[in-house]
Each structure stands twice: as C-alpha cells, then as structure tokens.
Amino acid sequence: METFKLAKRDIVLGVRKKMRYPVFVIVCLIGCMNFSGLMEDGLELFGKSNPSMANCFAFIFQGIEPMIRKNTMSEFVIPPVWLMLMLLYLLMPLDYPIKSMEVWGSQYLIRTSRRSWWNAKCIYTIGINILTFLLQIMIIFLFCLIKQMPISMHNNQKFYEALYGGNGVHSSLEISVWGNILLLIVLPLLGIVAMSMFQLFVAVWINPYIAYLLSIGILVCSVLLDSPILLANHTMTIRSALVCENGIGIGEAILWCIGIMALVWIMGVLFVKKKDMLVLKKEDV
C-alpha cells in the first residue's frame, strides 16, 4: 500500500503543470491532419472499405522500411510525426523521478524505503505512459468523429501494403479487429513503456541527459535496423511485424517488451539499496 500511495502522489505531481502535453496534442493533431490529406489524395488506398480509426493509427505507427535494406543511405529519412511522438512519450516521465530524489530524498529514507521509492517510480513511469497514450487515443477518436469516419479497429491487408508502396504483407496473423488492436495499440504501448523503463534506470543510476540521448540513439538505430533489442521497433509495428520478411513477430515483440520491463524493474530493486538518495542540487546547497 505504501508503494501505491507514493505512485499515486508521483503521478499527480508528475503530470501537473507540464507544458509538454499541449505540444503532444499539437503533434497528434499534425499526424491526424496528415492522415486527412492522405484520405483526400488517395482513397484507393482503403480498398472497398471507408477510412477508419484503425487506418489513422496505422498511418501514425507505420514506421518505414529499415534503412539498412535501402540501396543508398541518401534515402535515410526518419518519420517526423512518429519521431516527435516518441520523443515526447519518452520526455513525459523523465525528469520527475530525479527531482523527487533531489528534493525529497531524505523524507523517503525517513518515512519509507528505497525499494518502495523505486517501485513507485516504476509504476509512475508506466502510469504516465498509459495516460499519454490514452490522450492520443482520445485525440484520434475525436478526429474520427469530426471527420465522420467509422470508429472501428478494422482495416484490410491492401491498406498496409499501400502504405509501403505495394510491398507484400509477410504475416500469418489474420488482420482482424483483435489483430489490429494488438498491432496498433497494445504493442506500441508496450514498446513505449519498455523504452521508458530502460530510460528510467539509466536516468537514476547515471544521468537523465545521458538517458534521453541513449533513447534518441535507440530511435535512430531502430529506423536503420529491424532488431527486437532496439525497442523502438515495437512502436513501428506494421513495418516490424507485417512488412519485413522474417521480421519481428507479435508474440516475440511482446515477450521482448515485457522481458525488458521486468529485467529493469528487478535490477532496480536489487541496486536501489546502495543508491545515494541524499543528492542535492547545487542551488539547494
């Protein structure tokens, strides 16, 4: 109960007065408007069905073909909306855990334990990512309502192929409603949470700036290579799971994400006993 009380307090304080959320809303709206332009310019992409909410999710989380497979590196391009969203997802929970340790470290040692502090920060990181993802879902939902698009998680294989210039879809997964929920909601969220947990560990034990730079490096490397250890691949699920032949399967991706989250959490529990939580900022001394 002590851990959950701390986590609840952390989430409230971590969300309060964050100017990043208006920026996140703007980036989500840019993605939706880009999709709206696609609807107007290429209705043939949607086959016989009307554009749906699933199509909008697919457009935002599609990713691009791994650059290492391109004939020339001059074609190196990072999907701008995807990159901005990922940078904001990773930035949202980054600073608060360190600030809480700097400002209230002594109070944690007096009133609770290091282990409770770490567990609360893990729950905080997961909670912030879920809240931010729900915000994105709400924005896309409202966009679909305004555009009078079906609120459906159903689309077809031809749409996925069209996003990649006619490349075939290499997957035995039936692209059903539940298949799309896995591809477009569950897996991207798990990928974001796994990256944020890894970032939390590096931020607490090394430095938050180094942690964020490492996250940016993972994002860039994920555009180059389709490897499960590069966690950002799991947020480009159509590319990784459907378009790349011998790509990352849905089950494999879920196991990687959950495995990294569990590993980071357990390592934190083991190492936090020796963590100095009485660090003060220079201006506080």
Segments (PLM) and residue ranges:
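Alpha-helical transmembrane segments of multi-pass membrane proteins
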Residues: V27-G42, S222-P228
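Alpha-helical membrane-protein architecture signal
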Residues: T3-K8, R115, N119, W178-L182
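Alpha-helical transmembrane segments of multi-pass membrane transporters/translocases
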Residues: V23-I26, I192-S196, A241-V285
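Aromatic- and glycine-rich beta-strand/loop motifs that create alpha-glucan
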Residues: M1-F24
